[in-house]
Amino acid sequence: MARLGQLHNYHLLFKSQAVCPYLSHLNQASKILDCGVGTGAFSLALLESVAQSAHVSGVDISYPMLTQAQQTLKNRCTSLDLRCGDIRRLPFADESFDAVIFAHVLEHMAEPVETLREMSRVLKPGAPLIGSVTRKSLGQVLMSLHWHNRGYTSNQLASFLQATGLEAVNSFDYGTGWSRWMCLAAVGVKSR
């Protein structure tokens, strides 16, 4: 995604009025989980935009992506814990994280609501789940020929988060340029 200029758009997302208030509690002692961490760009944008430093855990199914994430994040975190695994079965205890984030991974899941439920399981009460997905569009259809991903509407994304029991759900577009037409973001908070 960094090659596509997404890092700048990720910064805009975390600094936006729709997301920033949910992250004001983060500090160096906070624990953040990035599901489908990939290259680490989404976590890096969060750290650079809001948290400065935190304990970051990341799960990805790809060892090469974890290697890239290690390079991206190694000097940016209070601590870094990267694990190869399936985000549908997270290797963490219930209510472990102060924030859970994900970028462009939900589109690859056959059961998006079940995947989000698993992410919500590891959130502490009152903590946010923040994610980015590909918007359902002609561009997404063309992308799916290469990446085999789904696209979602804003209403679909919001309904997925609501189905997990998250509160204060908001779904919106973000970024500049092509990202504004291709990406959606959502935020929800685990009930206390």
Task: Tell where the protein language model's regions lie, with residue ranges.
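Acceptor-substrate binding/catalytic loop of class I
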Residues: 141-156
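Core SAM-dependent methyltransferase catalytic element
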Residues: 175-192
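Conserved class I S-adenosyl-L-methionine
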Residues: 1-27, 41, 45
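Short catalytic micro-motifs in class I SAM-dependent methyltransferases
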Residues: 104-105
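A conserved beta-strand element that flanks and buttresses the S-adenosyl-L-methionine
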Residues: 101
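A short glycine-rich, Lys/Arg-flanked "PGG" loop and its adjoining helix->strand segment in the class I
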Residues: 113-125
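Class I SAM-dependent methyltransferase SAM/SAH-binding core
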Residues: 33, 39-89
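Conserved beta-strand signature within the Rossmann-like core of class I S-adenosyl-L-methionine
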Residues: 127-133
